[in-house]
Amino acid sequence: MDLAIQYPWFRRSLGSFYPSRLFDQFFGEGLFDYDLFPFFSSTISPYYRQSVFRNFLDSGISEVRSEKDRFMINLNVKHFSPEELSVKIVDDYVEIHGKHAERQEDQGRVSREFHRTYHLPSNLNESAIACSLSNEGLLTLCCPKTRPGDDSNWQDRPIPVSREEKQGTQPEIRADP
């Protein structure tokens, strides 16, 4: 009986064959060495690890944070302008939609579209929801929390997306009068 033996020094990532990379959003961008040869870097050094931070920023993955005093959603939408984004409240969910028409780029014609839906906690100050887009393409939705027991009655409405002028700032949270 033949047994397949994998030596510890030959541990390679499955690279583009691994299902988690199936929906990466790298359309129309340049290639890196590990995109062409995913096994090469880990074959030479089993201790080499690719940057998780780069993969997080470029993958379109969102981050949802529920802190003591506020609720935040961060989403990488670097391929979209504020005019191509739609953020709206529907029931107790926030829907984020981005779409731009087909356009010519260096590598060919590209069109992009996405839909994301997030459940909103019931203890948010609905009138103070703010949404902004940074220069780096990070969409930030921020909302302060109310006192425990104060539940929101969500009304369907659009949320305007503002463009941040400064790098690394978060949208202002308006105080309820």
Curated annotation (Swiss-Prot):
GO CC, alphabetical: cytoplasm; nucleus
Record GO biological process: lens development in camera-type eye; negative regulation of apoptotic process; protein refolding; response to heat
Every sHSP domain range: 52-162
Annotated segments matching region Disordered: 146-177
A GO term for molecular function: metal ion binding
Similarity-based family: Belongs to the small heat shock protein (HSP20) family.
Task performed by this protein: Contributes to the transparency and refractive index of the lens. May act as a chaperone, preventing aggregation of various proteins under a wide range of stress conditions.
Name of this protein: Alpha-crystallin A chain
Species whose genome carries this gene: Squalus acanthias
Lineage: Eukaryota, Metazoa, Chordata, Craniata, Vertebrata
Gene name of the encoded protein: cryaa
